[in-house]
């Protein structure tokens, strides 16, 4: 038996049905996939899309628009292209590529999109900053005056790095480039201690960007940083060799963005790009697939701009808070927190082939940066580690950031070593050397031994000044070269225990007055005699 609907009920039923109807309309700007493969998609229909804008593909795959052409747009995919097929719908997001930033990122391993990949749960942050951003203008910058200590004697003495500088680390594979960068991160631990901050030390937050590395290598780096307590103030951004080329291409920009968050809020950050050679290769792959015209070594014409726009973002910002808030391209999300006095220091790494620094990418990055640390296979294999070739390594702006005590003791160090290298080659041919030449060879040999340093044992700057003073003043000339490193360890331990006042004076004053020099010389000479009696047979 059917229930008849009475005519007077119809209007009430219709009114009830229509009351639940949602009249809002969702408007999407959509396009269609014309072609997909090798991490690239060509899309028809997204006529109003912007370059660098994120687009949404099916199966939660995100892409970024790089090519804008008359009849289609070219996008790179940050996920697998196997899931996407011809005819799929693509949505505009109207959002330029950005990552979440904040203190919650410290101690975590993330991918270049800011998503955690360390299995420690979600990261809660409120601020997002764009991956691409114009570098600060000239009026918002401040000269590099403050040192960034690496803890490596060879670098802090002869190739000093200042906060806000760009210093290239360049060398063949297996010469210790990553080790120099990791030692620098570990050395920043001293700036995070309570005692250091009470004395006015400004902590340095670190970002390590691993581009195109093996996943096992990245895991090893994270393990080393955790072991030395350095992950507390470090973020690792990883785009491994197995990740899509577009992720490898954007990874350094993600590192720069995170570093800018600390820089623009009045703090200090250090970002390490390991390495930009692999980023250039990933960008070349993406560009060729997008059918951009190739240039030298098949790199696209804008490969210089790829690195220059990244490295120019490293800067020391003016101390004027009001001026810092007016900085060009400062995102609205960070404006209320903006402060002056911050810095972003960049240590890009470039891998050379058979020591050829005149190749395309190495010469590009050398011309962009404020100096380079050149590591050599021959030095590495001969046992000099870190294997820094002091002759062609240079820091163009770090000299003004060096502490006075270090500048004084290391003033002649570069010249002494250069003369030693020259004489060493000459001495191989003849045995009859005059006394002055023999003295120079003896002094140089001791200095080379002093500059050797183990991995993951960065040294405080006051200890560096003390041991370099002993070496450059010729106090160790009578000690056999093979005992120099043993003497160094014992001497610094003795200073720490019995003459802490000398180290404290150097640390607080940043220089050595005549009294400190006299006292240090006496202590060193006395200890040398005792050491010789115990060790020289």
From Swiss-Prot:
What name does UniProt use for this protein? ATP synthase subunit alpha
What the entry lists under HAMAP family is as follows: ATP_synth_alpha_bact
User: Which residues carry the site feature described as Required for activity?
Assistant: 393
Key words, A-Z: ATP synthesis, ATP-binding, Cell inner membrane, Cell membrane, CF(1), Hydrogen ion transport, Ion transport, Membrane, Nucleotide-binding, Translocase, Transport
Read off the lineage from the record: Bacteria, Pseudomonadati, Chlorobiota, Chlorobiia, Chlorobiales
Name its species.
Chloroherpeton thalassium (strain ATCC 35110 / GB-78)
SUPFAM superfamilies given in the database record: C-terminal domain of alpha and beta subunits of F1 ATP synthase, N-terminal domain of alpha and beta subunits of F1 ATP synthase, P-loop containing nucleoside triphosphate hydrolases
Q: Per its database record, what is this protein's job?
A: Produces ATP from ADP in the presence of a proton gradient across the membrane. The alpha chain is a regulatory subunit.
Topology of this chain in the membrane: Peripheral membrane protein
